[in-house]
Design a protein with these regions (language model features):
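Short proline/glycine- and acidic-rich turn/helix-capping motifs at secondary-structure junctions
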Residues: 129-140
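AMP-binding/adenylate-forming catalytic core of the ANL superfamily
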Residues: 3-5, 12-13, 20-29, 34-124, ...
Length: 156
C-alpha cells in the first residue's frame, strides 16, 4: 500500500466514520487511501490498483488493473472492469466485465483470455468473461467495483 505522512499528525479523517479513519492509519499522521503502488529506481511512484479491488485466488493476490490494462488494448473491447467472483476451489476468481465495440467482429471468451495470457502470467488473467451494456461509471468516470461484485456474492 501507498502511505502518506501528514506533518500535522492528523492524517485522514473520514466524516462520521471513526472506524474507517482508524483503519487507514498505521501510526499517528501516517495513513493510506488504499492505493497499491511501487517506486522505480528513479524515485517515481506508480499507482497500480486499489487494495479493496484485490482478488485473492488460491492464495495468490491478483490486482485486476493488470488484466484491465491488457484487455482494453484488444480491438473488440471498448471498456472493462475485472472483479473477483466466487470460486469453490480457489475462493475467488477474476471475471472480466466487458463493453464491446459492436462495429467490430465479435471475439470469443477464449480469444480474450488468450490475449491476456500472451502478455501476463496466466493466474493474473480472468477465468471468465461477461459482455455487459454498462459498467456503471459515475460522473467522475469511476467504476464502483463493490457494486459490480455484489450480485455474484448473493448466494455465497
Amino acid at each position: 500500500k501507498l502511505y502518506f505522512k501528514d506533518a500535522s499528525g492528523r492524517g485522514i479523517i473520514y466524516h462520521n466514520d471513526p472506524e474507517k479513519s482508524a483503519a487507514a492509519h498505521i501510526a499517528p499522521g501516517i495513513f493510506t487511501l488504499g492505493e497499491i503502488a511501487y517506486m522505480n529506481e528513479e524515485g517515481y511512484v506508480f499507482l497500480t490498483d486499489r487494495f479493496s479491488d484485490m482478488v485473492v485466488s488460491g492464495g495468490a493476490n491478483i490486482y485486476p488493473a493488470e488484466a484491465e490494462q491488457i484487455l482494453i488494448e484488444h480491438p473488440f473491447v471498448m471498456d472493462i472492469a475485472c472483479i473477483g467472483v466466487p470460486n469453490k476451489e480457489m475462493g475467488e476468481e477474476l471475471k472480466a466485465l466487458i463493453i464491446v465495440d459492436s462495429s467490430r467482429k465479435e471475439a470469443s471468451e477464449k480469444e480474450l483470455i488468450d490475449w491476456c495470457r500472451e502478455k501476463i502470467s496466466h493466474y493474473k488473467c480472468p477465468r471468465s468473461v461477461e459482455l455487459v451494456e454498462d459498467l456503471g461509471r459515475n460522473t467522475m468516470g469511476k467504476i464502483n467495483k463493490r457494486k459490480l461484485r455484489a450480485p455474484y456474492w448473493l448466494d455465497s
